[in-house]
């Protein structure tokens, strides 16, 4: 998937370089995002009148957020600032970052998340390791269809530095035009 997406970008006239993710991304995903997402949910649902209708996964997340400590949230915010600095270094050398949109192939619609990815047990956010850090840093990103894997639709994400929204949007039509004509424009729903 990544190689094919990189080749498509090259065919569209872009230089593509492989680089390991900054270590700050993994630290963020492991230590900061669980705190930020659960406390954020607790904040948003302070006045929600239908908490009894939450899925069990969201109810658990809400309970963690309500039990969270301010010191944990401040530590998570410090990790976000470290990640922002690490990504600023990346964007000094590269215009955009290419990642998968998800760490997992599509899973059944009646399941809240995949239980395993690449043979490893994961929690409810295991599939989102490529998007959570982008959201927390407030960076623009574009999800693009990238074909099929094991007969399932998959995508890639292009992430840009702050203020690069127009660059990302301008790239989308060229990406779409380079799609394999056999790729359906709408994925069949089953």
Annotate each PLM feature.
Residues 28, 107-110, 153, 168:
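Short glycine-/acidic-enriched loop or helix-start segments at secondary-structure transitions
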Residues 1-32, 66-68:
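Gly/Ser-rich, acidic/histidine-flanked active-site/gating loops
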Residues 3-12, 74, 85, 135-190:
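Structural helix-boundary/capping segments
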Residues 95-96:
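Short, Asp-centered acidic motifs that coordinate Mg2+ and/or phosphate
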Residues 106-128:
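Short, surface-exposed loop/helix-turn segments at secondary-structure junctions
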Residues 35-88, 100, 104, 143-153:
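Short helix-loop capping/hinge segments that flank enzyme active sites or metal/cofactor-binding pockets
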Residues 88-89, 120-145:
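Small-aliphatic-rich amphipathic alpha-helix that forms the alpha element of a beta-alpha
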Residues 26-38, 113-115, 157-159:
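Short low-complexity, flexible loop/linker segments enriched in glycine and/or proline
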């Amino acid at each position: 998937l990544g190689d094919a997406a990189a080749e498509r970008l090259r065919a569209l006239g872009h230089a593509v370089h492989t680089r390991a993710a900054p270590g700050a991304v993994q630290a963020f995903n492991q230590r900061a995002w669980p705190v930020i997402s659960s406390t954020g949910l607790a904040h948003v649902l302070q006045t929600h009148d239908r908490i009894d209708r939450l899925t069990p996964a969201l109810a658990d997340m809400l309970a963690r957020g309500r039990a969270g400590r301010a010191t944990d949230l401040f530590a998570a915010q410090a990790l976000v600032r470290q990640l922002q600095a690490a990504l600023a270094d990346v964007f000094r050398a590269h215009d955009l970052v290419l990642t998968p949109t998800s760490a997992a192939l599509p899973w059944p619609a009646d399941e809240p998340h995949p239980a395993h990815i690449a043979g490893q047990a994961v929690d409810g956010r295991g599939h989102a390791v490529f998007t959570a850090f982008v959201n927390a840093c407030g960076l623009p990103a574009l999800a693009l269809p990238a074909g099929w894997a094991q007969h399932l639709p998959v995508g890639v994400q292009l992430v840009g530095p702050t203020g690069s929204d127009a660059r990302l949007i301008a790239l989308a039509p060229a990406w779409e035009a380079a799609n394999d004509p056999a790729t359906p424009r709408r994925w069949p729903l089953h």
